[in-house]
Curated annotation (Swiss-Prot):
Its main location: cytoplasm. Coiled coil: none annotated. It catalyses: hydrocaffeoyl-CoA + 2 reduced [2Fe-2S]-[ferredoxin] + 2 NAD(+) = (E)-caffeoyl-CoA + 2 oxidized [2Fe-2S]-[ferredoxin] + 2 NADH. Part of the homotrimeric caffeyl-CoA reductase-Etf complex composed of (R)-2-hydroxyisocaproyl-CoA dehydratase CarC, and the electron transfer flavoprotein (ETF) alpha (CarE) and beta (CarD) subunits. FAD binds at residues 122-131, 155-157, 267, 278, 335-339, 364-366. Signal peptide: none annotated. This is Caffeyl-CoA reductase-Etf complex subunit CarC. The keyword Metal-binding does not apply.
Length: 379
């Protein structure tokens, strides 16, 4: 229905890579150390995953949004945190540059993250401005030759690992969201510091921290796009970002369902497999049906984007439903495993922790409902 021959080839490539490289031993080590192996990231870059949906003319692999969804799904099925690294250059990090970057900015910032030579963070959220991104207090004052940035961004994925960050700041405090501009900030600049490395529930192996800016001088050529047009850049970037989280969600959910089915067939109680009990069998049927529905929402949103159609509502629907049912499926997978599901030795324990953030980051479920209802009910 949705997949081209190229899409099918990319699915096989992504699945084979994830299953071969992301072994249980490596993922257990990531959980213990909190660090993701650089050699695997280098291989992901070499295979073209970091530019899977970026045009070849810009150094990417030239795939479509469906190819991106497929790669995210297959990586997340094995490792949620690996899919975060895959997502970044294709989505939140690369997106702002694809939308508004100059030739020089593309060359200097986009191409190096595609090849894996550099990492770029997306910094929108603040301590007092999460869902209400327009309520940010970070400022950028035009000083003539440069902008002077002051403020704090919070919960920034990969911030401690990144070379640069796309920072959104108020250039006109009187205009609300229409007074926000985007900037590319060198994180080694004077006045930039990192908050503590957050100890997260899940997605261990991808550091998260605040970015603090105190009188940071940013060259004029590092403004991304037009003055006061940054909020539009951020929102358009998040459309693709939400597609990415939806893809993560169906991937992790598929992994959890696979583990639940496998365990239900092997585990015996009362003299028979627990899969033979209707309570378990119906639970699995429910999980599989909801997952299939979520996949169709995700693929539909990707298809609309590939056909150059507005998919804001559909991306929000996909993100909302897929993330919610992923949490439900992972919880049921743990339940099917019984006590073993609570033990780190079993994969579903990690999946259960990893998926919890899917209903929160890149727009909470409640924000998605606001977007969906707003588009349906507007005059």
């Amino acid at each position: 229905m949705y997949f081209s021959e190229q899409n099918k080839m990319i699915r096989k490539l992504a699945r084979d890579f994830a299953e071969k490289e992301l072994t249980t031993e490596i993922l257990d080590e990531v959980e213990e150390s909190g660090e993701f192996p650089q050699e695997i990231l280098d291989k992901m870059a070499k295979f073209g995953f970091f530019g899977i949906k970026i045009p070849k003319s810009l150094g990417g692999s030239g795939g479509d949004h469906m190819s991106y969804v497929i790669c995210m799904e297959e990586f997340a099925r094995v490792s949620g945190v690996a899919s975060v690294y895959l997502s970044s250059p294709n989505s939140l990090a690369g997106g702002p540059l694809l939308l508004s970057g100059t030739e020089e900015q593309i060359e200097k910032y986009l191409k190096p993250i595609i090849t894996g030579k550099k990492k770029l963070a997306f910094a929108l959220t603040e301590p007092g401005a999460g869902s209400d991104a327009g309520g940010m207090s970070t400022t950028a004052v035009d000083m003539g030759d440069y902008y002077l940035l002051n403020g704090r961004k919070t919960f920034i994925t990969m911030a401690p690992l990144c070379d640069d960050a796309v920072i959104y700041a108020k250039t006109d405090m009187s205009k609300g969201t229409r007074g926000i501009s985007a900037f590319i900030v060198d994180l080694k600049s004077e006045g930039v510091s990192m908050g503590k490395n957050e100890h997260k529930m899940g997605l261990i192996g991808c550091a998260t921290s605040d970015i603090i800016m105190e009188d940071v001088k940013v060259p004029k050529e590092n403004r991304l796009g037009e003055v006061n047009k940054g909020f539009s850049n951020a929102m358009k970037t998040l459309d693709v970002g939400r597609l990415g989280v939806a893809s993560q969600s169906i991937g992790v959910a598929q992994g959890a369902l696979d583990e639940a089915i496998k365990y239900a067939k092997e585990r015996k109680q009362f003299g028979k497999r627990i899969a033979d009990f209707q309570a378990i069998a119906f639970m699995i049927a429910d999980m599989a049906t909801k997952l299939e529905a979520a996949k169709l929402l995700v693929y539909n949103a990707a298809s609309l984007m590939d056909n150059k159609k507005n998919a804001t509502k559909e991306a929000s629907m996909a993100k909302f439903y897929a993330s919610e049912i992923c949490n439900e499926i992972c919880a049921k997978a743990v339940q099917i495993h019984g006590g073993y599901g609570y033990i780190k030795e079993y994969k579903v324990e990690r999946m259960y922790r990893d998926c919890r953030v899917f209903t929160i980051y890149e727009g909470t479920s409640q924000v998605q409902q606001m977007v969906i209802s707003g588009m349906l009910l507007k005059k």
